[in-house]
Amino acid sequence: MNLLEKTRKINAMLQNAAGKPVNFKEMAETLCEVIEANVFVLSRRGKLLGFAIKQTIENERMKKMLADRQFPEEYTKNLFNITETSPNLDINSEYTAFPVENKDLFKNGLTTIVPIIGGGERLGTLILSRLDKEFHDDDLILAEYGATVVGMEILREKAEEIEEEARSKAVVQMAISSLSYSELEAIEHIFEELDGTEGLLVASKIADRVGITRSVIVNALRKLESAGVIESRSLGMKGTYIKVLNDKFLTELEKLKHH
């Protein structure tokens, strides 16, 4: 395969993903195939987002890292010192992806580090490793292309998380603003009583203690439930089981108390 064919192989994987999130494991496997090296896609904190192995490394520590999908903290921190592609680092480099405790076995091990950058910030690191054969310009072009794609994907995921966060918050704020003053008061007492995200509640007890009617409590719970903020289930004489579904709810409720 020449460089163009290899690039097309990466493109084909991206085109197949069409609109769907790019799978980091698939990305690693494609790069592993075209570059013929072990490939590790790491997040900023050293979480292994995807990997593919070309040459098996028989080493317990490495096996555990792959099983736990986590690279050591110290190693991950040091990667931030590398700000541009660093090819063909040998076994004596602190950045080697080979186990240093087996130096003699991997004395011809070469590692290439490619920073993953997107939106002007460091998002992770792409690590390539193989034995004997040096990484050449063609390999580095493919690796940097792969790192760019991974960077864009991480940014897209981040944007989705921010969007989801904003949506959750808006739903909660709308649900709370739909409550009347007495319903809001009832809800505050209910969640003080629950002291957590789920539990059992006896509506009549709260109604008596706070001095409101039971129907106010029922209405308040119904409004929150129809907004998808909580779920509730009647357990007859035992009371009502309540569970918070939207993790922004208790935070927003807490804010209201301090206003």
Swiss-Prot record:
Role noted for this protein: DNA-binding global transcriptional regulator which is involved in the adaptive response to starvation and acts by directly or indirectly controlling the expression of numerous genes in response to nutrient availability. During rapid exponential growth, CodY is highly active and represses genes whose products allow adaptation to nutrient depletion.
Localization per record: Cytoplasm
UniProt region (GAF domain), positions on chain: 1-155
Pfam family membership, one: HTH_CodY
GO cellular component terms, semicolon-separated: cytoplasm
UniProt-listed GO biological process terms: negative regulation of DNA-templated transcription
InterPro entries: CodY (IPR014154), GAF-like_dom_sf (IPR029016), GTP_trans_reg_CodY_C (IPR013198), Transc_reg_CodY_N (IPR010312), WH-like_DNA-bd_sf (IPR036388), WH_DNA-bd_sf (IPR036390)
Gene expressing this chain: codY
Keyword Repressor: yes
Protein known as: Global transcriptional regulator CodY
Entry's Gene Ontology molecular function annotations: DNA binding; DNA-binding transcription factor activity; GTP binding
HAMAP family named among the record's database cross-references: HTH_type_CodY (MF_00621)
UniProt main location, coarse: cytoplasm
Keywords: Cytoplasm, DNA-binding, Phosphoprotein, Repressor, Transcription, Transcription regulation
Family: Belongs to the CodY family.
Segments of the chain annotated as binding DNA: 203-222
Regions crossing the membrane: none
